[in-house]
């Protein structure tokens, strides 16, 4: 069976449809949703396969959208139609089976059983072995500047099937629709489709192999690459050499201003930076990543929205953001920050919303008294009355010892089934578990 026949097999296409549906995602330029995929393929599968086998299949232009990057700029994405997405996914599944055993052990992005945690473990291994000079490579607009002819040439080294190579080139040249205008694509691999990650890794695998042949220690995650050496002199020499190689061999431009040589404490890789304890190098989230988490929570807890929203909905939104952030950065050392800074700040903000939802001093008094009696907290009637009727603003009122103690972390974390309200995640407990 040829590669294109494997790609178009019933099993492979069905798996592709299943994955595209599971990933959901926005519609392409034809507005077809993922929910329409199965009925569409049931009706048109035969003609789609025939057009591909006859080299007559024409992928539609991708729809250009922009998403914010961590540095505040916008990242362009290209959203294929859902039918094109299925074909891309089917190709990607077979390419992964070919390339996974070929790819470098030091490439971590978009690969099975690899993620930022495995990448960071390797970085820490290098640092603790004494490779403490870091070359932080920045490839300018990598996905937008991949050379099509070079990529096809690299593909042909492992993919000996003209139909498959032809189909991949068609996807590369499908064009982009931006604000209703279609422009051709003669360069680049648009991010947003299932084929983009594997093609980007295939292209940069040549770079990985070059670094390996030189005996260099490196970690690459998609287009983010750090190289680790023992001295600043070696770092200068390696940076010049690999920059030249990338530009000559892969036609990629390395940013002269963003590519830098740093010590680990000044390094920023995948949202982490580094510090040295008595037991060795460790990683932690960058300060700006902590700041972005806090900004997201501030948006959820914006008073005019959060006060009018059911508390259960607010807790659900908060839990989703906090758990997702901690899951990503869990490998980093951040116990002290979560315990002493983030956790108390979060609960203070939540208490403000709860007390403001109670509105009237009498309601505040009644509710605090209920908690006081239910948990035998021991506050006097006068203490609770004083807090409920204070002239302090909401924020200062909810910072008092009485409110902090009564609306405790434990109380907030308990779900309320009657009101269909989940418990608020305790960030420290979630991080430590």
Regions inferred by a protein language model and the residue ranges of each:
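Non-catalytic, polymerase-adjacent accessory regions of viral genome-replication enzymes
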Residues: 1-42, 46
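Conserved polymerase palm-domain catalytic core
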Residues: 51-66, 70, 102-266
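Conserved phosphate-binding loops in nucleotide/dinucleotide-binding enzymes
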Residues: 76-77, 81, 283
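Electropositive, glycine- and tryptophan-enriched low-complexity nucleic-acid-binding patches
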Residues: 88-108
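A conserved non-catalytic segment of reverse transcriptases
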Residues: 173, 249-313, 321-323
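Extended C-terminal regions of large enzymes
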Residues: 358-433
